Amino acid sequence: MKGGVNTIAKKKHEITVEIIGGNAEGVTGSCTRIKTSEHCYLFECGMIQGNHTVLENYRANMKYIQKVKPQEVEFIIVGHLHADHIAMIPTLYARGKCNAKIIVPKGSTSILKEMWLDSSYINCRDIEVINLKNERNYEPFYTEDTVYKALEFVQEVDSDKIVNLSDELAIKYTDAGHILLSKQCEVYINGGSHTRKILFSSDLGNIATQDTRVFVEDFKPVSSANIAIMECTYCSKDRQCTKETYKKDIEKIKSVIEQYCVDNNARVLIPSFSLDRTPYILWILYSLFGNDENFKVPILIDSPLANRLLDCYSSILEGDKKELFDEAMSWKNVQRIIQPENSKAAIADKGSKVILSSSGMLTAGRSIKWTQSILPRESDCILFMGYSGEDTLAWKIKHGKDNKTININGKPFKNKAQIYDLKSFSSHMQRQDMINYYKSINCEKIYLVHGDSNKIEFKHDLEDAISDCLKSTKVVAVNSGTKISL
Protein backbone atom coordinates (compact mmCIF):
# COMPACT_ATOMS: atom_id res chain seq x y z
CA MET A 1 0.00 0.00 0.00
CA LYS A 2 2.79 2.41 0.92
CA GLY A 3 4.56 1.73 -2.38
CA GLY A 4 1.33 2.43 -4.26
CA VAL A 5 0.99 5.84 -2.61
CA ASN A 6 4.53 6.78 -3.59
CA THR A 7 3.91 5.71 -7.21
CA ILE A 8 0.79 7.85 -7.40
CA ALA A 9 2.63 10.84 -5.94
CA LYS A 10 5.45 10.46 -8.45
CA LYS A 11 3.05 10.35 -11.38
CA LYS A 12 1.17 13.34 -10.11
CA HIS A 13 4.26 15.52 -10.24
CA GLU A 14 5.80 14.19 -13.43
CA ILE A 15 6.45 16.67 -16.24
CA THR A 16 6.98 15.52 -19.82
CA VAL A 17 8.39 17.80 -22.51
CA GLU A 18 8.26 16.89 -26.21
CA ILE A 19 9.57 18.90 -29.15
CA ILE A 20 6.85 17.98 -31.64
CA GLY A 21 7.34 20.61 -34.34
CA GLY A 22 9.83 21.00 -37.16
CA ASN A 23 12.29 22.55 -34.71
CA ALA A 24 13.20 19.04 -33.49
CA GLU A 25 15.36 18.51 -36.57
CA GLY A 26 15.12 21.74 -38.58
CA VAL A 27 15.07 25.51 -38.20
CA THR A 28 11.33 26.20 -38.63
CA GLY A 29 8.03 25.03 -37.16
CA SER A 30 8.74 25.71 -33.50
CA CYS A 31 6.40 23.75 -31.21
CA THR A 32 7.05 22.17 -27.81
CA ARG A 33 4.43 20.37 -25.72
CA ILE A 34 4.59 20.34 -21.92
CA LYS A 35 2.36 17.81 -20.16
CA THR A 36 1.77 17.28 -16.48
CA SER A 37 -0.59 14.77 -14.89
CA GLU A 38 -3.61 17.01 -15.44
CA HIS A 39 -2.57 19.80 -17.80
CA CYS A 40 -1.16 20.45 -21.27
CA TYR A 41 0.68 23.54 -22.52
CA LEU A 42 2.42 24.52 -25.75
CA PHE A 43 5.46 26.71 -26.12
CA GLU A 44 4.90 28.24 -29.57
CA CYS A 45 3.18 26.64 -32.53
CA GLY A 46 4.86 27.79 -35.73
CA MET A 47 4.80 26.93 -39.39
CA ILE A 48 7.29 24.58 -41.03
CA GLN A 49 8.79 26.49 -43.94
CA GLY A 50 11.18 23.89 -45.31
CA ASN A 51 12.98 23.73 -48.61
CA HIS A 52 10.16 21.80 -50.29
CA THR A 53 7.12 22.37 -52.48
CA VAL A 54 4.06 24.15 -51.13
CA LEU A 55 2.20 20.82 -50.96
CA GLU A 56 5.04 19.12 -49.07
CA ASN A 57 5.13 21.97 -46.56
CA TYR A 58 1.36 21.74 -46.17
CA ARG A 59 1.56 18.02 -45.44
CA ALA A 60 4.46 18.46 -43.00
CA ASN A 61 2.52 21.07 -41.03
CA MET A 62 -0.67 19.01 -40.98
CA LYS A 63 1.28 15.95 -39.84
CA TYR A 64 2.78 17.68 -36.82
CA ILE A 65 -0.31 19.64 -35.84
CA GLN A 66 -2.27 16.36 -35.69
CA LYS A 67 -0.11 15.44 -32.68
CA VAL A 68 -1.91 18.15 -30.69
CA LYS A 69 -5.40 17.64 -29.27
CA PRO A 70 -6.78 21.21 -29.29
CA GLN A 71 -9.25 20.63 -26.46
CA GLU A 72 -6.42 19.52 -24.11
CA VAL A 73 -4.26 22.64 -24.46
CA GLU A 74 -4.78 25.25 -21.73
CA PHE A 75 -2.05 27.77 -22.54
CA ILE A 76 0.01 28.53 -25.66
CA ILE A 77 3.07 30.60 -24.78
CA VAL A 78 4.73 32.69 -27.49
CA GLY A 79 8.35 33.87 -27.47
CA HIS A 80 8.30 36.00 -30.61
CA LEU A 81 6.18 36.70 -33.66
CA HIS A 82 7.91 35.25 -36.72
CA ALA A 83 5.63 32.92 -38.68
CA ASP A 84 7.73 29.84 -37.96
CA HIS A 85 6.92 30.37 -34.27
CA ILE A 86 3.25 31.46 -34.33
CA ALA A 87 1.54 30.83 -37.68
CA MET A 88 -0.06 27.45 -36.85
CA ILE A 89 -1.75 28.60 -33.62
CA PRO A 90 -5.12 29.46 -35.24
CA THR A 91 -5.21 25.95 -36.75
CA LEU A 92 -5.97 24.61 -33.27
CA TYR A 93 -9.07 26.83 -33.07
CA ALA A 94 -10.11 25.80 -36.60
CA ARG A 95 -9.74 22.07 -35.87
CA GLY A 96 -11.79 21.74 -32.73
CA LYS A 97 -12.89 23.14 -29.43
CA CYS A 98 -9.72 24.92 -28.38
CA ASN A 99 -10.04 27.33 -25.46
CA ALA A 100 -6.34 27.79 -24.77
CA LYS A 101 -5.20 31.21 -23.67
CA ILE A 102 -2.47 32.57 -25.93
CA ILE A 103 0.23 34.29 -23.88
CA VAL A 104 2.31 36.93 -25.68
CA PRO A 105 4.71 39.70 -24.64
CA LYS A 106 3.06 43.03 -23.92
CA GLY A 107 2.48 45.05 -27.10
CA SER A 108 2.42 42.04 -29.44
CA THR A 109 -1.24 41.70 -30.39
CA SER A 110 -1.34 44.10 -33.34
CA ILE A 111 1.65 42.39 -35.00
CA LEU A 112 0.27 38.93 -34.20
CA LYS A 113 -3.00 39.82 -35.90
CA GLU A 114 -1.29 41.00 -39.10
CA MET A 115 1.00 37.97 -39.24
CA TRP A 116 -1.94 35.58 -38.84
CA LEU A 117 -4.08 37.36 -41.43
CA ASP A 118 -1.22 37.31 -43.93
CA SER A 119 -0.55 33.64 -43.24
CA SER A 120 -4.23 32.83 -43.75
CA TYR A 121 -4.34 34.75 -47.03
CA ILE A 122 -1.24 33.02 -48.42
CA ASN A 123 -2.35 29.56 -47.28
CA CYS A 124 -5.88 29.90 -48.70
CA ARG A 125 -4.43 31.09 -52.02
CA ASP A 126 -1.91 28.22 -52.09
CA ILE A 127 -4.62 25.66 -51.34
CA GLU A 128 -6.69 26.89 -54.30
CA VAL A 129 -3.70 26.35 -56.60
CA ILE A 130 -2.89 22.93 -55.08
CA ASN A 131 -6.48 21.73 -55.44
CA LEU A 132 -6.71 22.85 -59.07
CA LYS A 133 -3.39 21.26 -59.94
CA ASN A 134 -3.99 17.97 -58.13
CA GLU A 135 -7.78 17.72 -58.44
CA ARG A 136 -8.01 17.33 -54.69
CA ASN A 137 -9.95 19.06 -51.94
CA TYR A 138 -7.37 20.06 -49.34
CA GLU A 139 -8.59 22.40 -46.61
CA PRO A 140 -6.66 25.54 -45.61
CA PHE A 141 -5.13 25.58 -42.15
CA TYR A 142 -7.56 28.32 -41.14
CA THR A 143 -9.50 31.28 -42.50
CA GLU A 144 -9.69 34.95 -41.64
CA ASP A 145 -12.68 34.21 -39.39
CA THR A 146 -10.55 31.78 -37.38
CA VAL A 147 -7.89 34.46 -36.90
CA TYR A 148 -10.40 36.76 -35.22
CA LYS A 149 -11.65 33.86 -33.10
CA ALA A 150 -8.10 33.06 -31.93
CA LEU A 151 -7.40 36.73 -31.17
CA GLU A 152 -10.13 36.61 -28.51
CA PHE A 153 -7.88 34.26 -26.49
CA VAL A 154 -4.74 36.44 -26.62
CA GLN A 155 -3.43 37.70 -23.29
CA GLU A 156 -0.47 40.10 -23.11
CA VAL A 157 1.87 39.91 -20.12
CA ASP A 158 4.69 42.11 -18.84
CA SER A 159 8.36 41.19 -19.07
CA ASP A 160 11.05 40.95 -16.37
CA LYS A 161 8.71 39.65 -13.67
CA ILE A 162 7.11 36.32 -12.81
CA VAL A 163 3.47 36.19 -13.92
CA ASN A 164 1.19 33.50 -12.49
CA LEU A 165 -1.05 32.01 -15.18
CA SER A 166 -2.61 29.28 -13.01
CA ASP A 167 -2.00 27.42 -9.75
CA GLU A 168 0.46 25.20 -11.62
CA LEU A 169 1.98 27.52 -14.25
CA ALA A 170 3.93 30.77 -14.15
CA ILE A 171 6.24 32.44 -16.67
CA LYS A 172 8.82 35.18 -16.88
CA TYR A 173 9.74 36.91 -20.14
CA THR A 174 13.29 38.22 -20.66
CA ASP A 175 14.54 40.14 -23.71
CA ALA A 176 16.00 37.91 -26.44
CA GLY A 177 17.26 40.69 -28.73
CA HIS A 178 16.12 38.91 -31.92
CA ILE A 179 13.35 41.21 -33.19
CA LEU A 180 11.02 43.77 -31.63
CA LEU A 181 9.31 42.26 -28.54
CA SER A 182 11.19 38.94 -28.84
CA LYS A 183 11.58 37.17 -25.51
CA GLN A 184 13.17 34.20 -23.85
CA CYS A 185 10.70 32.53 -21.53
CA GLU A 186 11.25 30.95 -18.13
CA VAL A 187 8.41 28.51 -17.52
CA TYR A 188 7.76 27.60 -13.86
CA ILE A 189 5.73 24.47 -13.15
CA ASN A 190 4.55 23.96 -9.59
CA GLY A 191 4.57 20.28 -8.68
CA GLY A 192 3.27 20.74 -5.15
CA SER A 193 6.37 20.05 -3.08
CA HIS A 194 8.72 21.57 -5.66
CA THR A 195 8.80 23.89 -8.67
CA ARG A 196 10.69 23.09 -11.86
CA LYS A 197 11.94 25.77 -14.24
CA ILE A 198 12.34 25.33 -18.00
CA LEU A 199 14.13 28.03 -20.01
CA PHE A 200 13.01 28.41 -23.62
CA SER A 201 15.25 30.61 -25.75
CA SER A 202 12.81 31.01 -28.66
CA ASP A 203 15.15 32.83 -31.11
CA LEU A 204 18.08 34.83 -29.74
CA GLY A 205 19.50 38.03 -31.19
CA ASN A 206 22.86 38.77 -32.75
CA ILE A 207 24.97 40.29 -29.96
CA ALA A 208 27.73 41.25 -32.41
CA THR A 209 25.52 43.83 -34.13
CA GLN A 210 22.84 44.57 -31.53
CA ASP A 211 23.92 48.22 -31.21
CA THR A 212 22.91 48.70 -34.88
CA ARG A 213 19.41 47.27 -34.39
CA VAL A 214 17.89 50.45 -33.05
CA PHE A 215 14.28 49.20 -32.80
CA VAL A 216 15.07 45.98 -30.90
CA GLU A 217 15.51 45.50 -27.15
CA ASP A 218 19.01 44.35 -26.16
CA PHE A 219 19.55 40.70 -25.25
CA LYS A 220 19.62 39.85 -21.53
CA PRO A 221 21.06 36.55 -20.25
CA VAL A 222 19.16 34.18 -17.96
CA SER A 223 21.38 32.64 -15.30
CA SER A 224 19.70 29.36 -14.30
CA ALA A 225 17.02 26.75 -14.91
CA ASN A 226 16.46 23.04 -14.35
CA ILE A 227 16.68 22.48 -18.08
CA ALA A 228 17.24 24.86 -21.00
CA ILE A 229 15.74 24.33 -24.46
CA MET A 230 17.90 26.50 -26.70
CA GLU A 231 18.03 27.41 -30.37
CA CYS A 232 21.12 26.79 -32.50
CA THR A 233 20.02 28.19 -35.87
CA TYR A 234 23.41 29.63 -36.79
CA CYS A 235 25.65 27.13 -35.06
CA SER A 236 27.70 26.41 -38.18
CA LYS A 237 31.32 27.57 -38.18
CA ASP A 238 30.78 28.79 -41.75
CA ARG A 239 27.89 31.12 -40.93
CA GLN A 240 29.35 33.89 -38.81
CA CYS A 241 29.15 37.67 -38.91
CA THR A 242 31.15 40.22 -36.96
CA LYS A 243 31.16 43.97 -36.53
CA GLU A 244 33.96 44.13 -39.10
CA THR A 245 31.97 42.26 -41.77
CA TYR A 246 28.94 44.38 -40.91
CA LYS A 247 30.88 47.61 -41.51
CA LYS A 248 32.15 46.30 -44.85
CA ASP A 249 28.63 45.36 -45.90
CA ILE A 250 27.30 48.80 -44.97
CA GLU A 251 29.96 50.31 -47.23
CA LYS A 252 28.91 47.88 -49.97
CA ILE A 253 25.24 48.95 -49.69
CA LYS A 254 26.28 52.58 -50.06
CA SER A 255 28.52 51.94 -53.06
CA VAL A 256 25.95 49.70 -54.81
CA ILE A 257 23.15 52.27 -54.50
CA GLU A 258 25.43 55.10 -55.60
CA GLN A 259 26.66 53.09 -58.60
CA TYR A 260 23.31 51.78 -59.83
CA CYS A 261 20.74 54.33 -58.69
CA VAL A 262 22.68 57.60 -58.60
CA ASP A 263 25.23 57.16 -61.41
CA ASN A 264 23.34 54.84 -63.78
CA ASN A 265 19.67 55.70 -63.12
CA ALA A 266 18.96 52.00 -62.49
CA ARG A 267 17.03 49.96 -59.94
CA VAL A 268 18.16 48.07 -56.84
CA LEU A 269 15.78 45.46 -55.41
CA ILE A 270 16.33 44.45 -51.79
CA PRO A 271 14.07 41.46 -51.02
CA SER A 272 13.18 41.84 -47.36
CA PHE A 273 10.97 40.11 -44.84
CA SER A 274 8.12 42.30 -43.65
CA LEU A 275 8.62 41.79 -39.92
CA ASP A 276 11.81 43.33 -38.53
CA ARG A 277 13.93 43.26 -41.69
CA THR A 278 12.06 45.99 -43.61
CA PRO A 279 12.27 48.65 -40.84
CA TYR A 280 15.88 47.62 -40.18
CA ILE A 281 16.92 48.10 -43.82
CA LEU A 282 14.95 51.33 -44.04
CA TRP A 283 16.88 52.65 -41.05
CA ILE A 284 20.19 51.64 -42.63
CA LEU A 285 19.30 53.47 -45.85
CA TYR A 286 18.20 56.54 -43.93
CA SER A 287 21.40 56.57 -41.87
CA LEU A 288 23.43 56.38 -45.10
CA PHE A 289 21.55 58.87 -47.26
CA GLY A 290 18.97 60.69 -45.12
CA ASN A 291 21.07 63.80 -44.54
CA ASP A 292 22.26 64.06 -48.14
CA GLU A 293 20.09 66.72 -49.78
CA ASN A 294 21.40 65.72 -53.20
CA PHE A 295 20.17 62.13 -52.80
CA LYS A 296 16.90 62.05 -54.76
CA VAL A 297 16.48 58.29 -55.24
CA PRO A 298 12.99 57.06 -54.27
CA ILE A 299 12.89 54.37 -51.58
CA LEU A 300 9.85 52.21 -52.29
CA ILE A 301 8.27 49.99 -49.65
CA ASP A 302 6.14 47.71 -51.81
CA SER A 303 4.53 45.17 -49.51
CA PRO A 304 1.04 45.36 -47.99
CA LEU A 305 2.12 43.38 -44.91
CA ALA A 306 5.31 45.38 -44.39
CA ASN A 307 3.36 48.62 -44.55
CA ARG A 308 0.79 47.39 -42.04
CA LEU A 309 3.57 46.25 -39.72
CA LEU A 310 5.27 49.63 -40.01
CA ASP A 311 2.05 51.12 -38.64
CA CYS A 312 2.22 48.60 -35.78
CA TYR A 313 5.80 49.62 -35.05
CA SER A 314 4.74 53.25 -34.92
CA SER A 315 2.19 52.50 -32.19
CA ILE A 316 4.41 50.08 -30.21
CA LEU A 317 7.73 51.91 -30.08
CA GLU A 318 8.37 54.47 -27.36
CA GLY A 319 10.97 57.06 -26.40
CA ASP A 320 14.19 57.25 -28.42
CA LYS A 321 13.24 54.22 -30.52
CA LYS A 322 9.98 55.87 -31.54
CA GLU A 323 11.81 59.10 -32.39
CA LEU A 324 14.32 57.31 -34.62
CA PHE A 325 11.57 55.32 -36.32
CA ASP A 326 9.46 58.40 -37.04
CA GLU A 327 12.54 60.16 -38.39
CA ALA A 328 13.20 57.39 -40.91
CA MET A 329 9.52 57.06 -41.87
CA SER A 330 9.17 60.79 -42.53
CA TRP A 331 12.18 60.82 -44.90
CA LYS A 332 11.00 62.52 -48.07
CA ASN A 333 12.43 59.76 -50.28
CA VAL A 334 10.18 57.06 -48.76
CA GLN A 335 7.18 55.98 -50.82
CA ARG A 336 4.79 53.39 -49.37
CA ILE A 337 2.97 51.32 -51.99
CA ILE A 338 -0.24 49.62 -50.93
CA GLN A 339 -2.54 49.11 -53.92
CA PRO A 340 -1.74 46.48 -56.60
CA GLU A 341 -2.20 48.96 -59.44
CA ASN A 342 0.38 51.30 -57.89
CA SER A 343 2.79 48.39 -57.57
CA LYS A 344 2.31 47.50 -61.24
CA ALA A 345 2.94 51.12 -62.25
CA ALA A 346 6.11 51.27 -60.15
CA ILE A 347 7.40 48.03 -61.71
CA ALA A 348 6.73 49.40 -65.21
CA ASP A 349 8.80 52.52 -64.45
CA LYS A 350 12.43 51.56 -65.13
CA GLY A 351 13.87 54.73 -63.55
CA SER A 352 16.18 54.96 -60.55
CA LYS A 353 14.80 53.54 -57.30
CA VAL A 354 15.52 51.28 -54.34
CA ILE A 355 12.77 48.73 -53.66
CA LEU A 356 12.11 46.98 -50.36
CA SER A 357 9.66 44.20 -51.08
CA SER A 358 8.78 40.92 -49.41
CA SER A 359 9.40 38.13 -49.13
CA GLY A 360 13.10 38.00 -48.42
CA MET A 361 13.56 34.53 -49.96
CA LEU A 362 11.35 35.40 -52.96
CA THR A 363 8.89 32.67 -52.02
CA ALA A 364 5.79 34.88 -52.15
CA GLY A 365 4.70 38.50 -52.35
CA ARG A 366 5.40 41.35 -54.71
CA SER A 367 9.16 40.79 -54.61
CA ILE A 368 8.60 38.01 -57.17
CA LYS A 369 7.03 40.44 -59.67
CA TRP A 370 9.90 42.84 -59.10
CA THR A 371 12.38 40.03 -59.70
CA GLN A 372 10.69 39.13 -62.98
CA SER A 373 11.19 42.74 -64.12
CA ILE A 374 14.72 43.29 -62.78
CA LEU A 375 16.46 39.93 -63.33
CA PRO A 376 16.58 40.17 -67.17
CA ARG A 377 18.13 43.67 -67.11
CA GLU A 378 21.92 43.88 -66.94
CA SER A 379 21.73 47.47 -65.71
CA ASP A 380 19.69 46.58 -62.61
CA CYS A 381 20.70 44.90 -59.37
CA ILE A 382 19.31 42.55 -56.73
CA LEU A 383 20.87 43.01 -53.30
CA PHE A 384 20.27 40.14 -50.87
CA MET A 385 20.70 40.87 -47.16
CA GLY A 386 19.57 37.66 -45.53
CA TYR A 387 19.63 33.88 -45.45
CA SER A 388 17.87 31.98 -48.24
CA GLY A 389 16.66 28.43 -47.79
CA GLU A 390 17.89 25.88 -50.30
CA ASP A 391 15.82 25.68 -53.50
CA THR A 392 13.99 28.95 -52.84
CA LEU A 393 14.03 31.43 -55.73
CA ALA A 394 16.47 33.64 -53.82
CA TRP A 395 18.81 30.67 -53.35
CA LYS A 396 18.60 29.75 -57.05
CA ILE A 397 19.49 33.30 -58.08
CA LYS A 398 22.39 33.50 -55.63
CA HIS A 399 23.81 30.19 -56.86
CA GLY A 400 22.83 30.49 -60.52
CA LYS A 401 25.19 33.14 -61.87
CA ASP A 402 26.29 30.78 -64.67
CA ASN A 403 22.72 29.99 -65.72
CA LYS A 404 21.42 31.92 -68.72
CA THR A 405 17.85 31.74 -67.40
CA ILE A 406 16.11 31.31 -64.05
CA ASN A 407 12.64 29.76 -63.82
CA ILE A 408 10.10 31.84 -61.91
CA ASN A 409 6.67 30.27 -61.44
CA GLY A 410 7.42 27.85 -64.28
CA LYS A 411 8.56 30.49 -66.79
CA PRO A 412 12.19 31.16 -67.81
CA PHE A 413 13.57 34.67 -67.28
CA LYS A 414 16.94 35.88 -68.55
CA ASN A 415 19.52 35.99 -65.79
CA LYS A 416 21.40 39.23 -66.43
CA ALA A 417 20.98 41.46 -63.37
CA GLN A 418 23.91 42.08 -61.04
CA ILE A 419 23.63 40.06 -57.83
CA TYR A 420 25.09 40.90 -54.42
CA ASP A 421 24.74 38.71 -51.34
CA LEU A 422 25.58 40.36 -48.00
CA LYS A 423 25.82 37.99 -45.06
CA SER A 424 26.35 40.13 -41.97
CA PHE A 425 22.75 41.16 -41.25
CA SER A 426 21.64 38.05 -39.40
CA SER A 427 19.23 38.68 -36.53
CA HIS A 428 20.27 35.37 -34.92
CA MET A 429 22.87 34.87 -32.21
CA GLN A 430 26.17 33.69 -33.65
CA ARG A 431 27.99 30.49 -32.81
CA GLN A 432 30.58 31.69 -30.30
CA ASP A 433 28.08 33.94 -28.53
CA MET A 434 25.76 30.94 -28.15
CA ILE A 435 28.58 28.90 -26.63
CA ASN A 436 29.49 31.73 -24.25
CA TYR A 437 25.87 32.17 -23.16
CA TYR A 438 24.87 28.53 -22.90
CA LYS A 439 27.91 27.51 -20.85
CA SER A 440 27.09 30.30 -18.38
CA ILE A 441 23.61 28.93 -17.61
CA ASN A 442 23.47 26.87 -14.43
CA CYS A 443 21.25 23.93 -15.34
CA GLU A 444 21.11 20.14 -15.44
CA LYS A 445 20.73 19.73 -19.19
CA ILE A 446 20.71 21.86 -22.33
CA TYR A 447 18.56 20.63 -25.22
CA LEU A 448 19.51 22.00 -28.65
CA VAL A 449 16.58 22.69 -31.00
CA HIS A 450 15.93 24.84 -34.06
CA GLY A 451 19.08 23.71 -35.84
CA ASP A 452 20.20 21.61 -38.77
CA SER A 453 22.82 18.86 -39.03
CA ASN A 454 25.52 21.25 -37.78
CA LYS A 455 24.09 21.02 -34.25
CA ILE A 456 25.87 17.69 -33.66
CA GLU A 457 29.29 19.32 -34.05
CA PHE A 458 28.04 22.32 -32.06
CA LYS A 459 26.90 19.99 -29.25
CA HIS A 460 30.42 18.56 -28.91
CA ASP A 461 32.04 22.00 -28.92
CA LEU A 462 29.55 23.26 -26.33
CA GLU A 463 30.25 20.22 -24.14
CA ASP A 464 33.98 20.97 -24.33
CA ALA A 465 33.37 24.60 -23.35
CA ILE A 466 31.18 23.55 -20.41
CA SER A 467 33.81 21.04 -19.29
CA ASP A 468 36.46 23.78 -19.40
CA CYS A 469 34.29 25.68 -16.89
CA LEU A 470 34.38 22.64 -14.59
CA LYS A 471 30.61 22.23 -14.92
CA SER A 472 28.69 18.99 -15.44
CA THR A 473 25.78 20.25 -17.55
CA LYS A 474 24.80 17.67 -20.15
CA VAL A 475 23.99 18.67 -23.74
CA VAL A 476 21.45 16.87 -25.94
CA ALA A 477 20.98 17.44 -29.67
CA VAL A 478 17.23 16.94 -30.00
CA ASN A 479 15.65 14.78 -32.69
CA SER A 480 12.02 14.00 -33.49
CA GLY A 481 11.92 11.18 -30.95
CA THR A 482 13.31 13.11 -28.00
CA LYS A 483 11.13 13.03 -24.87
CA ILE A 484 12.20 14.86 -21.72
CA SER A 485 11.03 13.87 -18.23
CA LEU A 486 11.32 16.16 -15.22
Question: What is the meaning of each model-derived region?
Answer:
Residues 365-371, 426-441:
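A short, acidic, amphipathic alpha-helical segment used as a generic capping/interface helix at domain edges
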Residues 1-7:
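Short, Lys/Arg-enriched N-terminal segments with co-localized hydrophobic residues
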Residues 9-77, 82, 86, 93-280, ...:
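His/Asp/Glu-rich metal-coordinating catalytic cores
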Residues 253-393, 449:
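Hard-cation-handling environments
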Residues 443-448:
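Proline-aspartate-enriched helix->loop->beta-strand connector
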Residues 406-434:
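Generic long, charged, amphipathic alpha-helical segments
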Residues 457-483:
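Short acidic, glycine/proline-enriched helix-loop-strand junctions
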Residues 34-37, 188-190, 215-220, 284-291, ...:
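Short, solvent-exposed amphipathic alpha-helical segments in soluble enzyme
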